[in-house]
């Protein structure tokens, strides 16, 4: 007998429900009924969520995207599809909640009071479950094709007896709370809803998700995926990556990487989890996080096939199903050390991406139509999901061509890649701005914020490089004003998110983009009225094993690591994960007189200059000074200052997205690390 909850029938009255609850209290091992659960959810949390579709009927094949958009008759809430789970060769069921009484009791002790649960449920009752189902559960492609049966979602008033199922409810409830505005005041609560959210998530993660014994079921794997999405929407990309790595290992132990040879167990026989869809989600999510962070993937040889994923996926715009291997191929290209081989791979992947565009109907690429839609409506979800497919596609174009933006070895490819990156970045920013303008409160779509950061940096660097061209060689001159306005609007969205969520990451994103905007303003603005050169904002990036890039109004230059220069300390904003980015501003220069640095030799770390890292006012921790070693305009973070891999948001700062970006930008594809004789072609000087 399963310990999982069974979905109540739609016509079950309150009396029957109360009787069922009393029966459960009397005997937890007996079958029980649960009231219709509140529907909770969010907008799509990631641009790579897996959306599978059933085989289309003859009638559905005649429909195009525009005709299949939700209408006013479309159900507003997602319903459970009637497809059975994928057949497995070895599948068991666990029905022993009594084996973990201490864990269950510990989880229940972390639940908020019943009054708080009731109040929070009433505030979450209008939100949809779309992102939860579209992320890793088998669901129909369009609301009109779904049944009327509602999906039961976490109602902590009727807590589970098995710790895995109870942890699932706690994580789902936390995800729902995550999409309430942090500034929203909910009367009647004993604690702020964000504190309740953090306690629910932390307890489920520490007591269940970190216990390997409880990860041998599909439901345990589901909890890891939920945890990863929770970290993504919380802005902690590194912890999401670590969690997804654990999900990869767990899924492999359950045999999900071998269709037809599964060996997993389930806690609840009535669950609708599909192992093939879960594996596809895990692989695509892990690979995309690796691409953004500049880390190697653990699923390079993995493949997945979605059952019932037919040509209907093309109509619905299910991009991860159509091009599941592109992310992996880009990561492999980035790790190639033969320039010609890397160039051939780049051109082949580019051709593959262009082929994907031809598969989709023209209506799929029409401008977004979010105006006038309700935030939690089905129409808004499908439109946002389409925007996510766009962002995902253009982010792949960006990542593919970044290595050739600065590379002097391939002139023709450099021009093509620079235009491709600028165009893709522009499209990403436009769509992310539309999403944030439509719903500026929710913590969802956080992955889009990170992708938009990379897009904004790329677009500004493309214009800075264009200033180094003369006359008609500046191919972006007519787009400059519009692109600057787009980046500035993206900044406003980032600052709004930072203020609402006390988010250090978005605050750092805004600070960096502001400096790039100021640098891009041009050499003419760098001089004062009397003709004297004014102080500049200078962006200096050190990338491990590659070199240091200096971006200023007078151009871009790269310094190899083995260049010996006088060691000077500078105050400024230091950010970074594996390396560091240092922004030196005129205001910092004014303060340098009071902070003279000691000269540091490679063997003398005792005399390192100490600077205070600048933090936004929203930071919730008191930061200690960070010791730095500097060489000219090169700034490093000593090894002991790096936080643990699972550290919180404050410790990780930029999460490594910054240095991963510049690592690819500077090193190129298939190129060897720079040395003192290789930098001449990499220096760009502004044209007068």
From Swiss-Prot:
<dbReference type="InterPro" id="IPR007219">
    <property type="entry name" value="Transcription_factor_dom_fun"/>
</dbReference>
<feature type="compositionally biased region" description="Basic and acidic residues">
    <location>
        <begin position="58"/>
        <end position="75"/>
    </location>
</feature>
<comment type="function">
    <text>Probable transcription factor that regulates expression of the gene cluster that mediates the biosynthesis of Griseofulvin, an important antifungal drug that has been in use for a long time for treating dermatophyte infections.</text>
</comment>
<feature type="compositionally biased region" description="Polar residues">
    <location>
        <begin position="24"/>
        <end position="36"/>
    </location>
</feature>
<protein>
    <recommendedName>
        <fullName>Probable transcription factor gsfR1</fullName>
    </recommendedName>
</protein>
<dbReference type="GO" id="GO:0006351">
    <property type="term" value="P:DNA-templated transcription"/>
</dbReference>
<feature type="compositionally biased region" description="Acidic residues">
    <location>
        <begin position="1"/>
        <end position="16"/>
    </location>
</feature>
<dbReference type="GO" id="GO:0005634">
    <property type="term" value="C:nucleus"/>
</dbReference>
<dbReference type="GO" id="GO:0008270">
    <property type="term" value="F:zinc ion binding"/>
</dbReference>
<keyword id="KW-0539">Nucleus</keyword>
<keyword id="KW-0804">Transcription</keyword>
<dbReference type="GO" id="GO:0003677">
    <property type="term" value="F:DNA binding"/>
</dbReference>
<keyword id="KW-0805">Transcription regulation</keyword>
<feature type="region of interest" description="Disordered">
    <location>
        <begin position="1"/>
        <end position="95"/>
    </location>
</feature>
């Amino acid at each position: 007998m399963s310990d999982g909850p069974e979905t109540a029938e739609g016509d079950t009255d309150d009396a029957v429900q109360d009787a069922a609850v009393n029966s459960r209290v009397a005997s937890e091992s007996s079958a029980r009924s649960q009231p219709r659960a509140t529907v909770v959810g969010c907008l799509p949390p990631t641009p790579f969520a897996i959306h599978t579709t059933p085989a289309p009927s003859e009638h559905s094949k005649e429909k195009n995207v525009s005709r299949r958009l939700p209408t006013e008759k479309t159900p507003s809430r997602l319903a459970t599809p009637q497809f059975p789970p994928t057949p497995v060769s070895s599948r068991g069921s666990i029905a022993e909640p009594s084996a973990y009484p201490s864990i269950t009791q510990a989880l229940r002790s972390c639940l908020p009071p019943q009054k708080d649960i009731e109040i929070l449920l009433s505030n979450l009752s209008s939100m949809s479950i779309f992102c939860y189902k579209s992320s890793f559960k088998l669901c129909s492609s369009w609301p009109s094709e779904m049944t009327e049966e509602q999906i039961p979602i976490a109602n902590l008033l009727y807590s589970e007896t098995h710790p895995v199922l109870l942890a699932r409810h706690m994580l789902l409830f936390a995800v729902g709370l995550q999409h309430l505005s942090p500034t929203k005041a909910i009367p009647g609560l004993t604690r702020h809803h964000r504190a309740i959210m953090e306690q629910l998530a932390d307890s489920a993660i520490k007591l269940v998700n970190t216990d390997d014994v409880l990860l041998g079921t599909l439901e345990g794997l589901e909890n890891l995926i939920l945890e990863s999405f929770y970290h993504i929407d919380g802005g902690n990309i590194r912890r999401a990556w670590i969690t997804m790595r654990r999900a990869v290992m767990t899924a492999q132990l359950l045999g999900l990487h071998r269709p037809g040879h599964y060996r997993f167990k389930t806690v609840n026989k009535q669950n609708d989890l599909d192992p093939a869809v879960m594996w596809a989600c895990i692989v695509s999510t892990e690979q995309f996080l690796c691409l953004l962070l500049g880390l190697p993937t653990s699923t390079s040889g993995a493949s997945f096939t979605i059952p019932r994923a037919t040509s209907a996926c093309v109509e619905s715009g299910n991009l991860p199903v159509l091009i599941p291997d592109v992310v992996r191929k880009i990561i492999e290209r980035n790790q190639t050390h033969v320039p010609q081989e890397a160039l051939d791979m780049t051109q082949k992947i580019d051709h593959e991406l262009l082929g994907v565009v031809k598969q989709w109907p023209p209506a799929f690429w029409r401008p977004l139509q979010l105006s006038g839609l309700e935030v939690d409506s089905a129409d808004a979800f499908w439109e946002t999901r389409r925007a996510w497919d766009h962002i995902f596609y253009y982010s792949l174009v960006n990542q593919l061509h970044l290595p050739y933006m600065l590379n002097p070895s391939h002139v023709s490819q450099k021009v093509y890649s620079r235009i491709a990156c600028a165009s893709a970045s522009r499209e990403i920013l436009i769509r992310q701005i539309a999403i944030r303008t439509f719903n500026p409160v929710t913590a969802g779509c956080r992955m889009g914020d990170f992708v938009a950061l990379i897009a904004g940096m790329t677009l500004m660097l493309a214009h800075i490089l264009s200033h180094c061209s003369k006359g008609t060689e500046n191919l972006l001159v007519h787009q400059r004003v519009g692109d600057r306005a787009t980046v500035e609007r993206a900044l406003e969205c980032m600052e709004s998110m930072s203020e609402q969520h006390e988010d250090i990451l978005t605050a750092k994103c805004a600070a960096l983009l502001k400096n790039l905007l100021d640098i891009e303003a041009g050499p003419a603005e760098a001089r004062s009225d009397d003709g004297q050169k004014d102080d500049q904002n200078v962006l200096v990036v050190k990338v491990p094993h590659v070199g240091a890039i200096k971006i200023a109004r007078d151009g871009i230059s790269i310094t190899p690591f083995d260049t010996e220069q006088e060691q000077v300390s500078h105050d400024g904003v230091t950010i970074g994960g594996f390396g560091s980015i240092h922004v030196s501003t005129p205001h910092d220069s004014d303060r340098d007189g009071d902070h003279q640095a000691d000269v540091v030799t490679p063997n003398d770390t005792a005399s390192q200059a100490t600077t205070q890292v600048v933090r936004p006012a929203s930071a919730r921790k008191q930061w200690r000074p960070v010791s730095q070693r500097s060489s000219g305009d090169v700034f490093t973070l000593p090894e002991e200052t790096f936080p643990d891999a699972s550290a919180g948001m404050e410790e990780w700062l930029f999460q490594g997205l910054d240095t991963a970006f510049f690592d690819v930008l500077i090193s190129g594809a298939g190129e060897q690390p720079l040395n003192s004789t290789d930098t001449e072609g990499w220096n760009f000087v502004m044209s007068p």
